[in-house]
Amino acid sequence: MANNYTYGIIGAMDNEIDTLVGDLENKKEEKKYGLTFYLGKLKKYDVVIVKCGIGKVNAGRTTQVLISEYSPKYIINTGIAGGLNQQLNIGDIVISTDLIQYDFDVTAFGYAKGYMFIGDKKEPTKYMADKDLTEKMKK
């Protein structure tokens, strides 16, 4: 198991990772659990790139395999976003500061959209992004 990867990069579709995979130096390919991982260097960083397939379940499964097998310090999801804001154009880079479960709705029970319950623990409506990583991405 390798533990020296700074970034794990996940994309849902081939066209979301192809350019990054093509730019890898010292590229190595590994197949695990039905997934193909591309290892190498992007600029000065050791990275592992993987296509997860579309959907939250595929993303979650692939993220767990990525963590278990390669232990990246940071995980980045790259890809195509839907038309959320008319001020955004193709090629724009969006860096999130927080996220919600957009498709999880318990408002009928008096809670905010995205509010989560896991066991007896109440989860926050918003999950905050890592501030250090957010700042690095802006550079």
Give the positions of each predicted feature.
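Short, conserved "active-site rim" segments that organize catalytic pockets and cofactor/ligand binding
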Residues: 4-24, 46
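Short glycine-aromatic motifs
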Residues: 23-31
